[in-house]
């Protein structure tokens, strides 16, 4: 058995592969494929999303929380496969407890992602936990809107849920490039550009 894989960089055209040996007694094989992505690089059929939005104790009354519609739009913009995700907004106590329990760091951080896929064949599933007081403080310090910062951190979390990491410079550059492109497509500025004075 022979397996052949052809990648076509021009998503506007069909990819084709033809194997025709010099020997006229041999079999010719032709393979064509219809593009599965649009010219913008997004899937032709959007991935299915099962989304649960949760609010920890006392968090639902905070100002500036994104709506479910916004969250769904941001999640889908960074999604490359069908997924079941929970986006949870928490206070500093819950954020700190989770960070200490799962990462051994005794402080609240802006976003934590818990990805449940054990290998590449597993469906995308995960929890994205945002600590509201930290997100609010960072947005103010970075002179960006709270909406833009929530969008960035949700996109960041969705990428983590799909296996993206930033443990070294190469991974960080790749992930940041995807985040920047995704957020700009949503109408936000580059989240990594230097802070305005």
From Swiss-Prot:
Domain of life according to the entry: Bacteria
PROSITE patterns: UPF0054
Gene Ontology biological process terms, A to Z: rRNA processing
Pfam families to which the protein is assigned, alphabetical: YbeY (PF02130)
Record has DNA damage as a keyword: no
Binding site for Zn(2+): 156, 160, 166
Keywords from the UniProt entry: Cytoplasm, Endonuclease, Hydrolase, Metal-binding, Nuclease, Ribosome biogenesis, rRNA processing, Zinc
Reported cofactor(s): Zn(2+)
Localization annotation: Cytoplasm
InterPro entries in the cross-refs: MetalPrtase_cat_dom_sf_prd (IPR023091), YbeY (IPR002036), YbeY_CS (IPR020549)
UniProt GO cellular component terms: cytoplasm
Cofactor note as given: Binds 1 zinc ion.
GO molecular function terms noted in the UniProt entry: metalloendopeptidase activity; RNA endonuclease activity; zinc ion binding
Enzyme Commission numbers on file: 3.1.-.-
Family: Belongs to the endoribonuclease YbeY family.
Functional description taken from the UniProt entry: Single strand-specific metallo-endoribonuclease involved in late-stage 70S ribosome quality control and in maturation of the 3' terminus of the 16S rRNA.
PANTHER family linked to this entry: ENDORIBONUCLEASE YBEY, CHLOROPLASTIC
Name this protein carries in UniProt: Endoribonuclease YbeY
């Amino acid at each position: 058995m022979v397996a052949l894989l052809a990648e076509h960089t021009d998503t506007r055209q069909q990819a084709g592969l033809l194997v025709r040996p010099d020997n006229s007694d041999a079999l010719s094989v032709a393979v064509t494929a219809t593009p599965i992505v649009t010219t913008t690089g997004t899937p032709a059929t959007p991935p299915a999303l099962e989304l649960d939005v949760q609010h920890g104790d006392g968090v639902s009354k905070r100002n500036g929380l994104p709506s479910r519609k916004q969250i769904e739009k941001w999640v889908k913009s960074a999604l490359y496969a069908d997924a079941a995700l929970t986006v949870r907004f928490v206070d500093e106590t819950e954020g700190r407890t989770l960070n200490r329990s799962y990462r051994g760091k005794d402080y609240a951080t802006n976003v934590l992602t818990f990805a449940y896929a054990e290998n590449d064949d597993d469906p995308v599933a995960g929890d994205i936990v945002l600590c509201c007081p930290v997100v609010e403080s960072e947005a103010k310090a970075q002179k960006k809107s709270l909406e833009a910062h929530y969008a960035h951190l949700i996109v960041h979390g969705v990428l983590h849920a799909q296996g993206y990491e930033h443990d070294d410079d190469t991974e960080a550059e790749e992930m940041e490039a995807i985040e920047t492109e995704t957020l700009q497509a949503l109408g936000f500025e580059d989240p990594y550009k230097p802070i305005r004075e």
